[in-house]
Every structure is written in structure tokens, then in C-alpha cells.
């Protein structure tokens, strides 16, 4: 599954492709793993399995951009001594794309802790993005043709609006309006505006990210209705399977929701959007990918 996108027509927008993704993609080696671990596979393993959407949470300490899950730092290996850095994530992505130039990787970039969003994005942009040939940074959903071999930046961080250096050309797809959905009384798919600097925006994306419903309710009220009623337009659609609360760990959510998902028949060539998963296996990734053909 390392090069499955080679068979997708190049004129498709990436939002028209059903993508398997991971939630808190780097939370493999982490303390308090019962409640905080979300992945069993490394970044490279995920990409080779077919994952194309990565959820990267960061903490800038003034010197380094560390990968974290909430306040906990993600670690490089099972010894849990050395912090995982964005440098490591980027190297894994670059190495994969150089070996598989037909593919694209979408990164949701979010400041989770540490310095404020302005300082975090300034460091991220100037250190990793500026003058890089690997990043697609326009505030517009691209065609697959324009981003094969590249990383599409989905920016939840919110670049400093006072900094004239930033524009709709170099700050990524603007997801800074991403709402906290658990404050809502319903679990219905939400339509969220994508702000633009240069003009009044008509862009939007769809979001289902209710993470503190119990697993059965999460499937019944959030995940399944999003699958059944997925809008067939060209907007991005995020459908999070992940969840965690006092009574249920990420692994329990995965076990209950995956079992129901495997029992639900998906239709080929229907748009379902982007599935954001904890602990995905090859079987569920293949099920998602095959809907594109």
C-alpha cells in the first residue's frame, strides 16, 4: 500500500479522495500509555501501510519543536528517554515521498502546548517551510497532480495575522477555525469556514470530532451518520473515529468502533472523506482505500 495513489486520477482534488489517516499520529511511545497512546506503528510504518493524513501536535519550547499529545511529550523509542521532534517527522515524510513520488502526505499541524501560536508558527515556518520544495502551502485545496511528492499543510495553528510575510500563498490551508465540538448538544457533522486573508472566503470543511462520547454512542451518533450522509461536494471532510474519556481508553474506542465499521459496507467511488483513526491495521486501511476505485 506504499504507492496506492498512483492509480488515482491526477485531476482529482485531494478532498475528493477517501483517505486513511491517524489521530495523534506520533503518540506511539509516550508516558501514561493506557490513556495517552494512540498508535502502535511508527510514522514510516504508517505511511507504508497506506496512511496519508497525519495529525501532528507540537510544543515549541523556544528552541525545539517537540511532538506531543496534550501536555505529554512523544518519545523516539520504547525507552521513552529522548523526545520526538518535528525534524524526525519531516525526515520520515521526506524519505517516504522520495521513494514514492506518486504519493502525497497531508499534515494537520496544531500547537498543543508550549509557546503561543504566533511564536510556534513563526519558528515552524522559518525553520521547516520557507523555501522548502516539499510543502504545498496555499490556502486552497489542491489537485493531486500539484502535490504528488509533496506535503500538504493543513494549518490549525493560525499564522500571525500582523506579520506581512504571511499570506494565503504560504500559510497552508487555514483550519484555525476548528471548533471544540464536545460543547455541542448534538453530534452532527459541522460545516466550518476556512478564512482567507485576501478576500471574503467561500471555502469550508466538514468536521466530526466528538471525542468524549462513549464508544457505542460515538459510532451511533457521530461516526456512522457521517459515513451514511457524507456530503458529495468537493469540500474536505474529517471523520474522527478516535475518542477517550474517564471510562474508555483509546484502545477500547478502537475495538468497539472498528468492529462496527468492518460490518458496514462501503460503496465504491462514493466520497466518504478522511478517516482519522487510532491504532489502524492493514485491514481497515485497505477497506478505506478500495472505496476510491
Report residues per predicted region.
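Acidic, glycine-rich loop-and-strand cores that form catalytic or ligand-binding grooves
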Residues: 169-240, 244-245
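Distinct, well-ordered alpha-helical segments
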Residues: 117-125
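Serine-dependent carboxylesterase/thioesterase catalytic core
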Residues: 113-115
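Acidic, His- and aromatic-enriched active-site or binding-groove loops in soluble protein domains
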Residues: 126-143
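Short, conserved, surface-exposed binding loops centered on an aromatic residue
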Residues: 142-146, 230
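Acidic beta-strand-to-loop metal/phosphate-binding motif
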Residues: 104-111
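Long, acidic (Asp/Glu-rich), low-complexity accessory segments flanking structured domains
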Residues: 1-53, 60-99, 104, 145, ...
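Intrinsically disordered, low-complexity sequence elements enriched in Ser/Thr/Gly/Pro
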Residues: 55, 182, 189, 195, ...
Amino acid at each position: 500500500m506504499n504507492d496506492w495513489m498512483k492509480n488515482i486520477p491526477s485531476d482529482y482534488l485531494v478532498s475528493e479522495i477517501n483517505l486513511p489517516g491517524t489521530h495523534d499520529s506520533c503518540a506511539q511511545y509516550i508516558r501514561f500509555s493506557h490513556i495517552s497512546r494512540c498508535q502502535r506503528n511508527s510514522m514510516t510504518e504508517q505511511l507504508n501501510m497506506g496512511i496519508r493524513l497525519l495529525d501532528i501536535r507540537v510544543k515549541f519550547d523556544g528552541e525545539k519543536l517537540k511532538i506531543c499529545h496534550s501536555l505529554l511529550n512523544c518519545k523516539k523509542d520504547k525507552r521513552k528517554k529522548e523526545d520526538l521532534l518535528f525534524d524526525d517527522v519531516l525526515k520520515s515524510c521526506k524519505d517516504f515521498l522520495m521513494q514514492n513520488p506518486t504519493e502525497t502526505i497531508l499534515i494537520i499541524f496544531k500547537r498543543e502546548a508550549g509557546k503561543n501560536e504566533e511564536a510556534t508558527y513563526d519558528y515552524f515556518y522559518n525553520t521547516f517551510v520557507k523555501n522548502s520544495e516539499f510543502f504545498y502551502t496555499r490556502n486552497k485545496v489542491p489537485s493531486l497532480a500539484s502535490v504528488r511528492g509533496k506535503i500538504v499543510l493543513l494549518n490549525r495553528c493560525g499564522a500571525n495575522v500582523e506579520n506581512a510575510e504571511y499570506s494565503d500563498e504560504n500559510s497552508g490551508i487555514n483550519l484555525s477555525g476548528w471548533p471544540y465540538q464536545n460543547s455541542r448538544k448534538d453530534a452532527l457533522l459541522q460545516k466550518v469556514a476556512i478564512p482567507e486573508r485576501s478576500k471574503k472566503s467561500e471555502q469550508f470543511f466538514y468536521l466530526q470530532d466528538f471525542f468524549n462520547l462513549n464508544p457505542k454512542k460515538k459510532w451511533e451518533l457521530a461516526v456512522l451518520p457521517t459515513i451514511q450522509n457524507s456530503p458529495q461536494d468537493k469540500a474536505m471532510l474529517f471523520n474522527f473515529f478516535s475518542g477517550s474519556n474517564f471510562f474508555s481508553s483509546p484502545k477500547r474506542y478502537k475495538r468497539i468502533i472498528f468492529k462496527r465499521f468492518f460490518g458496514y459496507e462501503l460503496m465504491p467511488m462514493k466520497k466518504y472523506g478522511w478517516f482519522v483513526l487510532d491504532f489502524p491495521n492493514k485491514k481497515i486501511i485497505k477497506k478505506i482505500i478500495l472505496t476510491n476505485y
